[in-house]
Each structure stands twice: as C-alpha cells, then as structure tokens.
Amino acid sequence: MTKSAELFAKAQDKIPGGVNSPVRAFAGVGGSPIFVERADGPLIFDADGKAYIDYVGSWGPMILGHNHAAIREAVISAAQRGLSFGAPTETEITMAELVSELVPSMEQVRMVSSGTEATMSAIRLARGYTGRDKIMKFEGCYHGHADSLLVKAGSGALTLGQPSSPGVPADFAKYTLTATFNDLDSVRELFAVNKGEIACIIVEPVAGNMNCIPPVEGFHEGLRQICDEEGALLIFDEVMTGFRVAENCAQGYYNIKPDLTTLGKVIGGGMPVGAFGGRKEVMQYIAPTGPVYQAGTLSGNPVAMAAGFACLKVLTEEGNEKRLADTTRHLANGFKELANKHGIPMVVNQVGGMFGFFFTDQETVTSYADVAKCDIERFKRFFHLMLKKGVYLAPSAFEASFTSLAHGPKEIEATLEAADQCFAIIASEAK
C-alpha cells in the first residue's frame, strides 16, 4: 500500500470522505487520491516522493507554477507585518486598482475570500439592484456551492452523479431557472415565460465545470442583447477563466462587457481570494453605500492581497499571455493528433491556459447533453494510465485541466510521449 493510500484511509476517520472538497476523492475516476507533500514549478510530489507533471494547478490558481518566488516573497513580507487586521489597508486599494485596470468593466471591486462567496454576493446584488428574485444559469455550469446555484450544477456535483444537491429547499430552487449552454432559444423561452421576473443571467464564459466548453459564435453577444432588452444584469463568472483565458479575462478575449464579474483562483495566486465587481452604479448598492448587505471577516486579507497582486504583476508581463496560450494549444493539438494516430475518437477544446478532452464520436461538444454522451469509462482508464506515467490530469471527466507558465517544452513533450503510450494501450484493449 502506498503512503497516499494509507493517508486516505486515515483521513476518512475524521474528514468526511477523507477530503475537504469532493472531487479530490477521485470519485470520478476511482481508486485512492494522491496526497501531495510539496510542489514546485510544473511538478507536484506525492507522499511517496513520486513526481507528477501537474495539469490541475490547485484547480486553476497556480498559473505561474507552484511555489513561484515572487508570490512566496510577497507572502513572507506581508506576513511579517501581520496576518489579519480586520481594518482597511492600502494593499486593498492597489489590488482593486490593478483589477479595474485589467478588467475595465469592473469599475468598482469588492474583495471576498472565495469564488463561491463572490458569485453568491453578485447574485444577491443583482436581485437587490433589479428588485427581481429569479436568476438564470446554465445546465452543467457551476458557480459555487450556494444553495440557489446548486440547481443542475456542474463540477463536483456532476462528478458525484448529483446534478442538484439534497439540502437545497424547493423554495430556493424555484427561483433558479436553467437554460441550455450555447442555446439562445432556451434563454429567450425562459424570459418569455418569466417576463419582468429575472434579475440576472450568470454564466461561465468558457464552461469549465463540465470539462472545457467554449461559447459558440454569437452566444455571448446574444446574452448581452437579451439582458439589455429585458432589463436583467449579465454576470460573467470568471472565477476559473479570469486572467487564465487572457490577461483581460474571457470578457476581453470575447469582447463582451458584463454588468458584474466574479473572480477567484488566479486572483489569489494560491491564497483564498475571491472578488466581484462591475458598474459603479450597480456596486453602489452594496453596503455600506447601499442596502444590499455583504461582509466578511477575512475579506481583503493583507497576506492574500499581497499574493494576488504579485501573481497578477508577473502574469501580465509582456509575452506571458501568448506563451501560456501557445503552450496549451501545443499540448491540446498534440492530444488530438495522438488520439487520431491510434484511431481513438476524441474532441479536444482549448482556450488560453485551459483545455479539456472528450472521448466521443461527436464532432463537437457544446453543451452538458453532449458531455453526458461521452465515454466516461475510457476517460477513467486514460487518467489512471497517465497517472502511472507521472502525469496528473484533472481526476474527473467533468473538469477542465490547466497549464502554467512553468510548463515548458520538456514537460509538454514528456506529457505527449506518455499520452502516445497510453492511447496505444487503450487502442489495443478495444480490439
């Protein structure tokens, strides 16, 4: 038995399921999860000392790679001045200014401590601003574990085979309308039936919680137009895509201006940080300037702000956005070419520094219904074969994978060499 397996067995005695976030338990792929001891650059090292090329990146935040010197030094410096004050700091201002500079639609920014907190707060704000109760989301999209957002959710909810969660009262769920991702007709139909009742549409601009699904042409433009016509707010949940798809986020990449934006993951550089922001007119409805209440003991934590600021400054240095996208594109194209070589039908999607692959005969994968048709068992087999060869992909067919600026030609070629061997095994097993 490996040390990771021993630790997993031990953890289950005191921690529900042995983990503190469900997808980490390998429920979507089977077997025991690896327990990580340390990480550096593009690599993680498990409790047995084995190294893996990491394409999970702490589920997105580690865009510079693990243990980056600039972030580490910023954290140490900030920690030496105190861990938390419960009072405003200048660092919060500089961080908000940088975010607004990079994401112009975020004229004002409120810092929080997680992506879930950001989306939950943004929706409360949208409801308060519009005076409407209903919200619209998309099947398979995940926006955190707030009650109203776990209706037909993606991510861990899909991995566990639960498109919605027990414990969410029916009275909450009835205010959440679910449309089909990449299908504007389904959006229009819901607005027609709920005229004047919908406060907002919340959407992942690239759906990353049912693997990786980009928008079809015209989808986001259509959402913007519909929201304008119906008096609803458009919320881009950029917790995953923020600063990863492009330095101006997915909204910059697709040239769409949402009313509100939520951020997380990359914005903290590995520390627990979230944020939401948007038009000043809307943000002024948040307390203390407005009636919509939102607060947090650790919001704007000085150590977390220092980490996030350092991360964004390095990330936005000239050439880094292109290098990250080029690296990810090379890897994604390599997966597709190797799958074709071995006669394995596969769809590979990639945007910026995120990618996903689907074992399927379909020509495209554009919605949750398409994802549900994919060969999950083949994904599980491929995941474990790659893991044995020292490549750590997202342990769920419903999760996107990520590269970092620390991933170089050496890591990409090693990954593709491993994939070539794993595809060969899978192809031979199918004969």
UniProtKB/Swiss-Prot annotation:
Molecular functions per Gene Ontology: glutamate-1-semialdehyde 2,1-aminomutase activity; pyridoxal phosphate binding; transaminase activity
UniProt catalytic activity: (S)-4-amino-5-oxopentanoate = 5-aminolevulinate
Broad EC category: isomerase
Key word Cytoplasm present: yes
Any Gene Ontology biological process: protoporphyrinogen IX biosynthetic process
In-chain residues carrying the UniProt-annotated modification N6-(pyridoxal phosphate)lysine: 265
Cofactor requirement: pyridoxal 5'-phosphate
Protein's UniProt keywords contain Cytoplasm: yes
Pfam name, any one: Aminotran_3
GO cellular component, one term: cytoplasm
Keywords in alphabetical order: Cytoplasm, Isomerase, Porphyrin biosynthesis, Pyridoxal phosphate
Record note on quaternary structure: Homodimer.
Protein name (Swiss-Prot/TrEMBL): Glutamate-1-semialdehyde 2,1-aminomutase
Gene field: hemL
